Regions:
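Short beta-strand elements at the ligand-binding edges of bilobed clamshell
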Residues: 1-4, 118-130
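Short beta-strand segments enriched in small/hydrophobic residues
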Residues: 10-23
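Hinge/cleft segment of the Venus flytrap/periplasmic-binding protein
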Residues: 22-23, 39-42, 131-174
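A conserved helix-loop-strand patch within extracytoplasmic ligand-binding domains
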Residues: 1-13
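Glycine-rich, charge-decorated loop segments at or immediately adjacent to ligand/cofactor-binding or catalytic sites
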Residues: 110-119
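Hydrophobic alpha-helical
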Residues: 54-111
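Glycine- and acidic-residue-enriched helix-capping/strand-helix junction motifs
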Residues: 21-33
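Short beta-strand elements in bilobed, periplasmic/extracellular small-molecule ligand-binding domains
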Residues: 13-14, 36-59
Length: 174
């Protein structure tokens, strides 16, 4: 979805939340592998510029790092965050009145939703956490209690949330 907007760019940013220089979740790591593979296959001329923010950073540290990043990369207009902290950049963009940067983020957490409504995040990928949790417990019950064979892979739906449809997202729907 981001590439519909950024296909003409030379560079895009990827914001990562890290601890000791490593991403903090396996999901975030897997998403990055998928992103880089997709970009290599479909947009090989576009360079991904990394921005690493420490998980235990303060707002002031984030502001300093983001200011330095955007000053050093004035042609960055699109950013993807592969974890649930898109709001860190979204808040910064709102406070510094940078309207030319579009963010794609993950996870429908409250702070991300607020930034989406205010326009500093362009869209979010929501993954129906309640449904995932239900399916996980259901599979565990079937495997352990009922001794049934379960499928090792369970594909789940995602939703693309925008400022126009975010208020209709049914977070707790099974």
């Amino acid at each position: 979805m981001l590439m519909l907007l950024a296909s003409h760019e030379q560079d895009i940013a990827e914001m990562k939340i890290t601890k000791n220089g490593r991403v903090v979740s396996k999901q975030q790591d897997n998403r990055e592998v998928g992103l880089r593979h997709y970009m290599k296959d479909h947009y090989p001329a576009i360079k991904i510029i990394n921005l690493e923010l420490p998980i235990d950073g303060t707002r002031q540290q984030y502001d300093n790092m983001l200011e330095q990043f955007f000053t050093g990369h004035p042609n960055i207009h699109h950013c993807i965050t592969l974890g649930s902290k898109a709001h860190v950049m979204g808040d910064f963009l709102l406070r510094t009145n940078r309207r030319e940067v579009q963010i794609m983020g993950y996870d429908m957490v409250k702070k991300n939703a607020e930034c989406l409504r205010q326009g500093s995040i362009s869209f979010l990928i929501a993954q129906h956490a309640y449904q995932q949790g239900y399916c996980s417990v259901d599979a565990l019950f079937k495997a352990v209690v009922l001794k049934k064979k379960i499928q090792p892979v369970n594909y789940m739906p995602i939703e693309l949330l925008t400022p126009e449809n975010v208020n209709f997202y049914r977070r707790t729907q099974l």
